[in-house]
Amino acid sequence: MTKALDFTTGYDSRRPLMMGHNAVATSQPLAAQAGMKMLQLGGNAVDAAIATAMALTVVEPTGNGIGSDAFAIVWDGEKLHGLNASGRSPASWHADLFAGKTAVPEIGWDAVTVPGAVSGWVALAERFGTLPLTTLAQPAIDYARDGFPVSPLIGHLWQRGYNKLKDQPGFSACFAPEGRAPRVGEIFRNPAQANSLELIAKTNGDAFYRGELAQKIAAFAKAHGAHLTEADLANHRVDWVELLSRDFAGGSVQELPPNGQGIATLIALGILEQCGIEKHHPDSVQGLHLSIEAMKLALADLDRYVADEEHMEFAAKALLSDHYLKSRAALINHDKASDFVYGSPTQSGTVYLSAADSSGMMISFIQSNFMGFGSGIVVPDTGISLQNRGCGFVLDPKHPNALAGSKRPFHTIIPGFAMDGNGKPLMSFGVMGGPMQAQGHMQMALRIMLHGQNPQAAIDAPRWRVVQGREVVVESTFDRNTIAALRERGHQIVVEDPLQDYNFGGAQVIYRMPEGHYVAATESRKDGQALVS
């Protein structure tokens, strides 16, 4: 059995621990309220999640939008379902288009792949929802049309995005209509996005992939010499997938299979079990050392092998075999930091949400533009910002994640889920934030499942992030003696203010208690909110 929760708190927190029969947790209060409204209208957890996701495209455009990708894990009361709603590259893409470049550009049309978030909303609504999409979209439409106050973190990220993307086609007209980024506390309106959301809801997504909006996206691409076409949009499809699972701490952790990085969490947890991690508290020097080394090994495998699963050299499950994980664990020196070869991950922006209802349905959902506002391309008169997920490809033709047409790139965004030892749902969770996501999932699992920390304490705890080589960035809230001890072991520790660049992710957790009600927790490093009823 997983360890019972400890409801004492050991860390400073800006957020209370919430408990109730229904729950929504995400990075923006207005979006959380949109989800809770659906539950109050008689909808279920999936209805709440879709409404929350659509609202997030409006109130947190610095991390996601209508032109994002999305992934989800759903517990329907009987079994788990995995959804991959990420898009593929334009069919006409090939490596020669990027000749002379060392990487796919991060901004502009050359980074744009087919957006999948809209298809994710529709697929979830059709399979699990109870309320019409027009109802689910209404809070988002109202926020976009009537305006919403820009929250503190979003105001900062908006300014940073404006500085980088203001000259990209359509960006300033949509997101800086007054010639500057909106300031914290100002009301921002996006009537074009309201119209697009309304059209998407009324047509059940068809307008985006085969109708008026698809035509506008393709025409704008053609006008700029880009490769995304109406056919690329029309050919998009979602995939319902079998989850990857790893037993851990008397329960199991569930992740979506590649093209995402969730498998790195499972690899690291499997390695740690071989190292006797249960003997070491996650704040102890030895616990931190082993966790860092296990994650470095997992990231090495992630960088070398993981891509669109249709293009991987072998099945992803091969990386999770006990024999393989034992061989990887044997490489860890329990007293000194080691060098493992892997690429330097890229920073990004994402939104995550979780919802649960009194019937027992739970959903873990994530969507993202990838890096902040994404490519910077905004389709005129639509409010649709397009993601830059294409820069997740590599240009090495021998790599399984090599750029090609009609192919999904490697993804950083991952929803997480955990089950107890009796096959019942334990928690839906996620830690948005690029390469922090798999690392954050592992840290949440260690703290909550293995050591029984309550979800808010686990979220508030100091975080660390492997970068490359022996470099590890830790939050400035880390104990100074612990930092010194890690340095003595050979770790190259960089101390960073958690609010400096927001690179330690944003966590949301909904934990199911044995009696069937929920404990909900939200990220104190973000503007988020957990709501219960």
Language model regions located:
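Noncatalytic scaffold domains of N-terminal-nucleophile
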Residues: M1-Q33, K37, A45-R210, A214-G260, ...
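Internal maturation/activation junctions in enzymes
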Residues: T2, Q274-N369, T382, R389, ...
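Active-site rim segments in enzyme catalytic domains, especially the processed small/beta chain
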Residues: V58-W75, K79-H81, H227-T229, M361-M427, ...
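Short beta-strand scaffold segments in enzyme catalytic cores
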Residues: N64-W75, V351-A356, P415-F417, G506-R512, ...
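Short, small/polar residue-rich loop motifs at catalytic or cofactor-binding pockets
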Residues: W240, Q347-T350, H411-I413
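Glycine-rich phosphate/pyrophosphate-binding beta-alpha loops
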Residues: Q254-G262, T350-S354, I366-I377, G430-Q437
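Extended C-terminal subregions enriched in glycine
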Residues: S359, K407, H441, L450-D501
